[in-house]
């Protein structure tokens, strides 16, 4: 069951630039029919990711990923850990983290200060290098990135020069 949109969400989510960003992201990442789920996940992230919840960040990220992938059977409080259990090879030939290391790497990343200390781009780069999920990693990273930056503008990928070419674990 998807969480209901927040009361504040109606005004924020009906803005044309929000839907344009969502449609651009899901199309860019090969899931053009999942814009509503992407919006739902972004609404959840922007209204539930707070510093007071920093010890729960990993669980929240898993929930956002399940939402962007259209999993309607989840609730925010109870669901299984669904990290990938296969190798991941990127289009540029680089590989994601060894799947057996994903729980440890995600735990370390989420306990680091990167997400909360204005180092969100570095957090997202590390998240994408780990590539913890079977599907929806890019959409999840976009939501995480824009959780911190959306009031200025929506961005698709971290702006650190060369990070895609250098993406290695």
Residue locations for each model-derived region?
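FIC/Doc superfamily catalytic core
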Residues: 1-169
């Amino acid at each position: 069951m998807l969480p209901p949109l927040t009361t504040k969400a109606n005004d924020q989510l009906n803005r044309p630039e929000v839907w344009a960003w969502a449609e651009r992201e899901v199309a860019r990442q090969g899931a053009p029919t999942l814009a509503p789920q992407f919006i739902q996940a972004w609404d959840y992230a922007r209204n539930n990711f707070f510093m007071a919840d920093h010890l729960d960040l990993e669980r929240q990220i898993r929930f956002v990923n399940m939402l962007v992938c259209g999993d309607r059977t989840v609730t925010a409080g109870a669901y299984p850990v669904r990290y990938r259990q296969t190798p991941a090879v990127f289009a540029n030939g680089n590989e994601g983290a060894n799947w057996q290391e994903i729980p440890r790497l995600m735990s370390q990343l989420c306990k680091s200060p990167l997400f909360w200390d204005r180092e969100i781009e570095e957090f997202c780069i590390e998240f994408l290098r780990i590539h913890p999920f079977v599907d929806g990693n890019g959409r999840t990273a976009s939501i995480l990135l824009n959780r911190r930056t959306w009031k200025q503008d929506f961005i698709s990928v971290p702006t650190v020069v060369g990070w895609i070419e250098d993406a290695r674990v």
